[in-house]
Amino acid sequence: MSKIGKFKEQDITVIPHNKEKYMSFSIGNLRFIDSLQFLNSSLATLTKNLADEGQKHFNYLSKTFPDPDVFSLLLRKGVFPYDYVDTEQKLEKPCLPSKEDFFNKLGDTHISDEDYQFAQTVWDKLKVKTLGEYSDVYLKMDVALLADVFEKFRDISLHDYDLDPCHYFTTPGFSWSAMLKKTGIVLDLITDIDMMLFVEKGIRGGVSSIFHRYAKANNPYLFDTYEPTEPTSYLSYLDANNLYGWSMSQCLPYGHFNWLTEEEKIKLDITKLKADGSDGYIFEVDLEYPSSLHSSHSDFPLAPERKHIQVEHLSPYSKELLQNLTGKQCLTKIEKLVPNLYDKEKYIVHYRNLQLYVELGLKIKKIHRVLKFKQCPWLKKYIDFNTEKRKNAKNEFEKCLYKLMNNSIFGRTLLNTRKHKDVKLCHTEEKLNKETAKPSYASCKIFNENLVAVEKKRVNVLMKQPIYVGFCILDLSKFLMYDFHYNHMKSLYGDKIRVCFSDTDSFLYHVETEDVYEDMHQYQDMYDTSDYPPEHFLHDIENKKSNR
């Protein structure tokens, strides 16, 4: 960035994360995009994944190093003593630095014997005379390998989606266009500010909580620790396959938003609303959490809320710890997503979740507002396409790509344009004076005498993302987790099971039963057991990677 200020005759524009970090920048008609915004893995990982499919995809590397033996040698990420080279004179060193000189301060890691031997082999094979020449080889390798990886990504994208990612800045932006093209859906944008704020208020992330701090299994399959005189119990970690993929395959809103009238709210029978109906609803309600449920629901309470935890919410022991360990008598003001047993006021919730909460014992005290919309499983076609592609992928490179294409859709639906930055790069005194004189001026970052980044306050915000889709995806993911816990696990084991912790799409259970594997076998249609050893009686590929 320190050099681009010298292009005085060209306009310089950026798409910023902040004053110093940019997603992309342009000099005149030349645009620079960041490959990391598309392929968010190390070059070492990307190269290895692509190499697993063979050498045929490394066209740029073979052109850069045409000797077949050298080409075969360089089919991996190179290594370089970054911290050692702190002066130009060291580039004149006539031999490879010692293994200790390859220590990476940034990663606080030493180079492996295998990597050092690779560096020595490259030095010898290419008849390198100085560390400077080795640096040239290293850089040519990096550029050629990244070019080959990105070209493979482009080939797949053009073949599967008929779109070129080079016309985009990030994978989420590219995947969003691919989804719109593949599904043909037209999404209405909310133009009513009250509806927008209503949906925003209901957005809550995944539940990540520790509910039970210590549990010890008495597992008969673990002979060293099993106590025959004690009740048999297991620690069972279960993970939902592609949780958000499942949510994105459900009926989702696409338009025709309107508030229900008082009369329509009275006539609406929540219990009779269909999961796959053409009409969907988002409710704002007051909920009562009956005290009779508190004991059985204490390890995974329904209807989690974003809350500021107050000192009065803490137990006497926790208050004492707060004082002794921090010297403070107050807590952070950062909101947390908290599962709790309190009654809820003006709780915004998807209708399917509300149906489940009522079925499990919560009571609706009052309905404040109801937002109605049209819905259908419009995203399912795209999700299924990528899921099937991932299932049939020939290598890790393609598996990661198709997974990313699905996951990035969810993130795109929750893109918060309020957080976007407005940054101008000024490379002339005239432009700098103009930008800093504006009332919207906020701050600046001086790179050098030729370049200054000026950050401005946002004058307006365009709310152009269908965040109502993201809200529904998040709530439906909670529906699946609560439904599985209460209507399967809790129904099966009763008070013999406890949630130790939950993290968005997973549970760690402490369950008291004679044989948890036999229990799973009875409900094998609910589980993906394809990763069990082939000789295990639970091994079955029927539900491999399935999210049904």
Model regions and ranges:
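Conserved acidic
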Residues: 1-548
